[in-house]
Amino acid sequence: NIGALKALAKPGDAITAVSTADGGHISHARMGAVGLRDLNVSTYPWDEERMEPDIDASCKLIRDVQPKITLVGQSVFLFPTPLRELADAAHEVDSTVMYDGAHVLGLIAGGVFQDPLREGADVMTGSSHKTFPGPQGGFLLSSSEDETFHRRLNNAMFPGVCSSYHLHHVAGKVVALAEFEAFGQAYAGDIVRNAKAFASSLAAEGFDVLAESRGYTASHQVLTRHGEIDSGAGARAAKKLEDAGIITNMNMLPGDTKAMSPSGLRLGL
């Protein structure tokens, strides 16, 4: 992400993004890469029932702020983002649309989530080690045919933020790409089916699973609420599960304001 931000914006520029409390990645906040690049961030109004940016209000924000970068994508990513609508608003004000697909890249590649570069994103970033099952690393992708734009992206990565591409990782990524080409579609489909079944089973057992009206999830993630806002119930639940040998992620849910005492868990399948 820092490479893309370096390519697309200068210090002091405006950016819009999902807030950390609503599922945005820490790199999208002042505490992370956005702050390192010294960008001024405005966060999207959030639709808590649909667990996505409020489309009309977010489009208005984009038109009002006129950000250099319209950043979409989250680390809590239950459903495809309403990308076409946000991208249309962004392009009206000459804003570059950046899609952070780190957590859902394998689902995108498997054809079971959304297709960001065909839905309006100018740039997509992604991890090679999450739902895409390869060695640690990342991808920076664009469908633009503008060679000047390509050079900006390439130069931001090297010599901008990376000095080596780690050849041993390249070999591992080649194997992962070959395996994904052969088995990725079925693999991605199974991930989403398993997550949906898991969420439904938790709900049937009485757990408070978010986004019931939308079938809980369309990705590999499931969110559960374990107490009141800022109660720390999510942290306590994560500790109990860790003691039982199950590693989960305490997570802020909409309304939470304290990262270390959130009310929820993020579960990944």
Briefly describe each language-model feature range.
Residues 1-205:
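Conserved PLP-enzyme active-site core in the AAT-like
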Residues 38, 137, 221, 264-266:
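Broad gene-expression machinery/nucleic-acid interaction feature
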Residues 112, 268-269:
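Short helix/strand-bridging catalytic loops that position acidic/His residues to coordinate divalent metals
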Residues 141, 223-225, 268:
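Short hydrophobic/aromatic beta-strand micro-patches
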Residues 177, 188, 192-238, 248-263:
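Conserved small-domain helix->loop->beta segment predominantly found in fold-type I
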Residues 241, 267:
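Hydrophobic, well-ordered secondary-structure elements that form the walls
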Residues 245:
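Glycine-centered, phosphate/nucleic-acid-interacting loop/turn motifs that mediate DNA/RNA or nucleotide
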